[in-house]
Amino acid sequence: MRAPRVLPLVAGSPLLARRRAIADRGLVAVCLALVAVTAFLALAGPRYLVESADRGVRQAVTEAGSRGDVLAEMPPAMGTVREGVRDPRLADKLESAANDLRAVLPDELRATVQEPVLSFQSTDLSLAAPPETGLWALRLGWVWSERSAGVRWVEGAEPGASPDVRAEYAAEREAAGYDAPVELRPQRVEVGVTRATADVLGLSVGSEIGLAGAVRDEAVAVVTGIFQPVDAAEDTWAGAPELLEPVVRQAKRGDHTTTGLLLSRESIADARSALPASGHRTIVRLAVDVPALTAARAGAVADDVASITANPEQLVLSGGRTLAVSTGLDEVLGEFATRLRGVTAQASLLLVGIVTVAGLALVLAARLLVTRRRTLLEAERARGASVASVALRLLLESVPVTLVGLVLGLVAALLATPGPTAVVWGPAIAVAVVAVLATPVLGAALVARAWTGRQLPANRQDRERVLGRRRAQRRTAEVTVVVLAAGAASAVRGRGLLQTQTSGVDLLLAATPALLAAGATILVLRAFPVVLGAIGRLAARRRGLVGVVAAARAAQAAGLGVPLLSLTVALALVVFAGLTAATVGVGQERASIEQVGADVLVEGGVTRELADEVLRQDGVDSAALGTTIGTRRLNGDGGEVVTLVLLEAAAYERVRAAVDPRYGGELAGLDGAGTDGPRVLVSPSLRAETDVAGARVYDGEQRVVLDVVGDTTMTFGPEPVVVADLGTYTAATEVPLAEDTLWVSGPGAPAAVERAIVEVEAVDLDVTVRADRLASERSSALVRALQQLLLLTSLVLAMFAAVTLVLTVVATAPERGRTLSALRTLGLDARGARLVTLGELSPLVVAAVLAGALIGVAVPVVLTSALGLRRVTGELGTTELVVTPLPFALAVGVAVLALLVSVVAEAAVRRRDRLGDVLRVGDR
């Protein structure tokens, strides 16, 4: 049996492919540019998002500060032989226990934390002879870390070990036969101080400080040296700042000052023997190694932290002892993960949209290329070339172009996003597959149809049966697309873009905008004949040829499905990206209003005196006192958990109206007398319960019946709220209520609050400035990356829309040219030719703009909650879509500009055609 001959299939194919590419170099360059740009976005987008996520999680942990540290408290007896007995190896045992703790941590957590920082601190001790003014407290402390630079002794020497007075006391009693009285001398503890502490307390080398308070017996601290830290900024000192300098806190009874006395490895045993079990704490602090933390690792780290916090028995040290673990790291990482999922949802929509539009544009370019070569390809087939050989030669042309485009896109992506982040190849490969196969498949289909010998039956009935079968197949495909789009939209609404069984984003759900655009395209194509027929009839009633010809050309235009779909998807995503960017920006501002509720929020020990002083300051418009009581049960056991917010209704109404544009005036009249009790507003989610069972809360044993007069969208935390006037509620209960919140509004509120706090000497206050919180949110690396991706995507999709329209104009130019040439022989001038071109293409552009704008608005409106925007903005309530004209202006402007440029360019090309040539040659 003879082997099949391959040479006729491939002979001369590389040379022919190269010559064809050179002949159509302009269109080939367009395909190359499309592949390169799309590959760049498909490769750089995920890398940039991952790098931004890494920066975001590091930023979140850094801003959390000590809240993100893992604290493990050792048992009081850790490292001791017996309570009250001095152990000279205490420091070694504690250091060993700290290192053992890090070794038994779960793998991911251990890889993410730094070397442990060990801190031994006494409780506050009193000075036996305190200074005359203020309140003073001393703390004996020792800190250790393998990465610490330590201290430098500038005067005196490092503290050393002191005699064990209890051992001496026991020996002296034994020597005296237990009969003679023996005096127990004070336990000597050698310490070091900084120059700042020495100056404040008037200490020098050799000074003795009598210690009083939580000590076992009498004890005296002896200063042996003055030190300074080699690096005062290192985190070893973060848990004990009083060791470096006195920590002063203002109080009405005078300054409350805490100062520290530094122990050494030798003197810590003396301090431990002088202190009771309840008089000290030994804490191991594990700070996060921020550069080692990545977004991919954050989830596993959070799981490890939650596991050891809930079950610290996993951390068993030598001797079977466990530690009490406390940290807020899991909460910090959980908050970040929530935001990351929201950003990922938006980015997935954009990436799928870009790949879809790019793929459609490549199909358009391939169709144009095949159409231009139709005569050559059909002639090649007529001379005996097989369909496979035709496809092979086209494949030899598309593969190098695609590979070059991929390489260019990859190089640009690596230059734009340098770093070790892995490359995600999936989206780029999808585009590459389309770029490689589009031209060969379309070319093979063309030559296969050209010489199949299949024709429509001459019999009318048989011909109608064949055409009917084709129409049924087409309608089935169209219905399938529409049903798929509706199903995807329904699934996103029901499950959410990220609430899937998979670990990430469901690509089918992420393709919802593209599927909806496909469904809209089908509906538009179905409506096209009706609309254009009506336009044609109107044009026929008017004088002139332009309107009739343009309407007829638009109605007879074939193959508009792909251009219309590409334009619709591109413009829809331009609108969607613009509206999403605006919604995120406004949503962050709304989130700051929800979280702060005023220009400045003061929490803690607020008083009427402070509120009055704030109102007297310049730049303050209003101020309202109140209190927030969380985790109350509405209507007793089994009721909803709510936050009870008591505030000065009239004053807070002025505050809220000044900062919240959405405030609806619901607080008006809240300070009046209710029918059954204090008037209250409730969150909308509580109305179903209050309408049936009423509303009541309990203050201790006293039941307070509430009169629900309306609902409110104001939020004061994650729980539903019950808002009442402070005065009327206080009058209805016998339980005394202390204000703990002050809301302030006004352009100068931040500075005014600071001045008022100093004036009244208020203490124990937490001040939150809304502008600062908003600035912090907007500086988030993750959200900023999303905003940049939205902007870049809008511009790129606008460019794709313009390219799609230009390709459509070029593809329809030959047929239109023949029509215009014939009309020129009948007297059509150049202006009329331009109007015919404009009229023919305008319905396509108008339909794409309208459908794209509709889909671009409908997706965020219908799917707002499912898209996870609330996770990005940080809003406590539902995110509301913000509609701005800029995205619509960009979509319309790009489409109109591309259309006008294409029409003018085509007219300029046809200006070179001479009427004599048209009359002589005829059909062009």
Question: Locations of the language-model features?
Answer:
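Juxtamembrane segments of multi-pass membrane proteins
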Residues: V483, A488-D671, G677, L681
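Membrane transport/envelope proteins' first extracytoplasmic loop
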Residues: M1-A358, L497-A510, L523, S592-L601, ...
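N-terminal Sec/SRP start-transfer signal
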Residues: M1-A42, Q461-V483, L525-L573, P814-G817, ...
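Alpha-helical transmembrane segments
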Residues: V352-G359, V423-G443, L508-I522
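Interfacial "coupling" helices/loops that link adjacent transmembrane helices in transporter permeases
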Residues: R20, L360-V399, Q461-E464, V803-V845
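Short helix-loop junctions at transmembrane helix boundaries
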Residues: L406-A430, A491-L508, A853-G893, V904-D917
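Hydrophobic alpha-helical transmembrane segments of polytopic membrane proteins
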Residues: V431-A450, A520, L886-A907
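C-terminal transmembrane helical bundles of large multi-pass transporters
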Residues: D740-L742, D766-S865, L869-T879, P887-A905, ...
